[in-house]
Every structure is written in C-alpha cells, then in structure tokens.
C-alpha cells in the first residue's frame, strides 16, 4: 500500500513537498506522561524495549499528540553491545553502563558478532508490530548507533566526559580499535538490514560522539565505518528507496566528507547554520535539523521565532527535514512541543510551492 503521508520520504529525496516535514529525536520518551506510565508497567527500560507491544505503544504515543511526519522505532543504541554479552544495565540518574569493558586486542577478539535476526529478534518484532499499527499512515524510521559511538560506550563502560580509555586504545593500539570497529560495522549493517526487512522504511545512524575526534581521527575511525555501512545496506525494499540519514553531533565542520558517504541526508546540530550547510552540500544531500532542544524551555512565542529563523535560514525549496539538533529533553513541557509543531505547520508552507 502507498503511504498516506510520504512527506518525509519526498524531502529526503529532495523532491517538492507542501510543507517542511518534521520528526524529533527521542520523540517517544520521558517528557510524555503517557510514556512514564507505560514505562512503569514495563518495569525496566530494557524490559520496555524487549516487549514488542509496549515498544509499539510508546512509539505511537507522540503521533497521537502531534502531527509528526514519521514514527521512530523505540529502542536504544546499545542493543548491539548488549547482544555482545557485555552486561548492559541502567543506573538511575547515570544512564547506561556495562559490567564488562573492551580495552585490549584480546577483549576485542573475544567479542561475539551477534546475528541480528536471532540475537536481536525482539527489535524486529517491535518493528513489525509498529508497522502493522501504523497502517501506512507515516513511514517508520529504524536506527543504530555508529561503530565509533558504540565503541566508546564499550571501552569506557558507559558515557564519558573525556573518552580517555577510548582514545588511549585508538592512539595506542589502532589495530585493536580498527578490529573493534570492523566487528561493529558488520554488526550494524546486519542490524539495520534486519530492521529494513522487518519494515523500517528509513534508517538513521546516530554518531553521538563523533564530534569529540580530531579531523583525521574522525575520518579514519568514525566516518569510514559509517560509509562502509551505508554501502552494505539494503537500499530498495517494498518497491521504494530506503533513505539513510547520518547524524554526527558537532560534525558541522565535516559536512563535505559526510555528504560523500553515500547517505541521502545529513543531520545537523544547532551549532551549524542551515544556510551555510545548504550552500556547502545542499546540492548533494538533504539536511535535517536543527532546533536547539533547549529552545523548547522558552515561551511559545520564542519557540515560534526560532522556528521562523531556522526556516528562513534554509530558505525556499525541498531538501529540509525539520528536527531538533539532539534528543528532546525529559524535562520538556509537552505543550511547548505542540507550540513548536504548530508553528512549523503554519510557517513552513510559504517556503514550498
């Protein structure tokens, strides 16, 4: 069946649309009271991810509230390292942690490469359940963390401020780091292809920590592996193109090389001006972004003003997907998200047609 709303797919292909499409990173999440209620039913965060019906429910919640142009699979970027038997757990207020770390060539060699269909079948069950529930209303976005970003969590044992263990391995034993990234690139390719086969119509690679690298290190240890993944992905499924979005937080200085990766779109955080990004790479890729999520803590008028500024910065014509520059904060007022979406719907049509 054709999609009732293919606005996002058209924008990613840089084809004309009637208004700028919008979705939000972490649009299903803790800022919504209904999410908190469902999370309470599930028990732990990973129990929520592993229950296809509940993962579907929280995926659908923001679409019931807001006129969004896509659903994004409710899951976590750390499902792959979890399937590598590193013992993922969540500390209240501290985020994800691993019971085991990977800090040597021997530890890298010992890592199993998961089979996505077998070891991450709960994710594919969620994708299938969500696609059925969506009933072709809007497209479903699947996702993964990038190899470099996954590696940082596996080496550090959780999130980090300085990434000293990851960078020590990268500079001190680059062969071991490349071996780890190679395993992860193969795993991510398999994982995203399994999501596409299960029904994901768009995929995004989240390179949350690529921006902490030097330019040569970014190209060698992050972007090269994302480009390899893009090359290995299923790009046609269910009779249509499957777009790929790459998002490196704080990666605006590398737009040209990211645009050469083979991806259809590049995600931007709020530190890169859209007009500048469009002038540099807008003839090659669509651009996604880039409202600072903290703008949503301001008044509805201030939110509207910033939406207007970003739309004007991109300018007229296709190729822009409106999003936040990072995930929506758990402390955001849902009514302020509504003000954001309403402002976009009201203001963006003048830039199209």
From Swiss-Prot:
Query: Which pathway, per its entry?
Result: Porphyrin-containing compound metabolism; protoporphyrin-IX biosynthesis; coproporphyrinogen-III from 5-aminolevulinate: step 4/4
How would you classify this enzyme at the top EC level? lyase
- Per the record, GO CC terms? cytosol
* Matching InterPro entries: UROD/MetE-like_sf (IPR038071), Uroporphyrinogen_deCO2ase_HemE (IPR006361), Uroporphyrinogen_deCOase (IPR000257)
Query: EC no.?
Result: 4.1.1.37
Catalyses: uroporphyrinogen III + 4 H(+) = coproporphyrinogen III + 4 CO2
Recite the UniProt keywords alphabetically: Cytoplasm, Decarboxylase, Lyase, Porphyrin biosynthesis
Query: Which CDD domains does this UniProt record tie to the protein?
Result: URO-D
Residues reported to bind substrate: 26-30, 76, 153, 208, 326
GO annotation (BP), single: protoporphyrinogen IX biosynthetic process from glutamate
Annotated site location: Transition state stabilizer: 76
Q: Which SUPFAM superfamilies match?
A: UROD/MetE-like
A GO molecular-function descriptor: uroporphyrinogen decarboxylase activity
Q: Which domain of life is it from?
A: Bacteria
Location(s), subcellular: Cytoplasm
- Quote the subunit structure annotation: Homodimer.
Give the protein's biological function: Catalyzes the decarboxylation of four acetate groups of uroporphyrinogen-III to yield coproporphyrinogen-III.
Give the record's family classification: Belongs to the uroporphyrinogen decarboxylase family.
Q: Which HAMAP family match?
A: URO_D
Spell out the protein name for this chain.
Uroporphyrinogen decarboxylase
Q: Which organism is it from?
A: Chromohalobacter salexigens (strain ATCC BAA-138 / DSM 3043 / CIP 106854 / NCIMB 13768 / 1H11)
Q: Could you tell me the gene encoding this protein? A: hemE
């Amino acid at each position: 069946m054709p999609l009732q709303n293919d606005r996002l797919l058209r924008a990613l292909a840089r084809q004309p649309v009637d208004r700028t499409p919008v979705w939000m990173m972490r649009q299903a999440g803790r800022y919504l009271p209904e999410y908190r209620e469902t999370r309470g039913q599930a028990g732990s965060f990973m129990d929520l991810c592993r229950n296809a019906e509940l993962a579907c429910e929280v995926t659908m919640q923001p679409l019931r509230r807001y006129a969004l142009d896509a659903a994004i699979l409710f899951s976590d970027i750390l499902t792959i390292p979890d399937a590598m038997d590193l013992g993922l757990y969540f500390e209240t207020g501290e985020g994800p942690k691993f019971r085991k770390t990977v800090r040597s060539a021997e530890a890298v060699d010992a890592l199993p490469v998961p089979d996505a269909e077998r070891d991450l079948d709960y994710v594919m069950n969620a994708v299938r359940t969500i696609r059925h529930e969506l009933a072709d209303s809007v497209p479903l976005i699947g996702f993964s963390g990038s190899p470099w970003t996954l590696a940082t969590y596996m080496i550090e044992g959780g999130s980090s401020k300085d990434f000293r263990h990851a960078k020590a391995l990268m500079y001190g034993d680059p062969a071991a780091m490349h071996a780890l990234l190679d395993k992860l690139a193969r795993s991510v390719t398999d994982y995203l292809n399994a999501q596409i086969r299960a029904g994901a119509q768009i995929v995004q690679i989240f390179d949350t920590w690529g921006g902490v690298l030097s330019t040569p290190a970014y190209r060698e240890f992050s972007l090269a592996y994302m480009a390899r993944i893009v090359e290995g992905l299923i790009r046609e499924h269910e009779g249509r193109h499957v777009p790929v979005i790459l998002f490196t937080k704080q990666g605006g200085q590398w737009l040209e090389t990211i645009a050469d990766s083979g991806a259809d779109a590049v995600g931007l955080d709020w530190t890169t001006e859209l007009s500048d990004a469009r002038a540099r790479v807008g003839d090659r890729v669509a651009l996604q972004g880039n409202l600072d999520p903290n703008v949503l803590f301001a008044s509805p008028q201030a939110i509207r003003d910033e939406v207007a500024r970003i739309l004007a910065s991109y300018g007229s014509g296709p190729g822009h997907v409106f999003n936040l520059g990072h995930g929506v904060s758990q402390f955001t007022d849902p009514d302020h998200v509504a003000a954001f979406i309403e402002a976009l719907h009201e203001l963006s049509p003048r830039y199209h047609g």
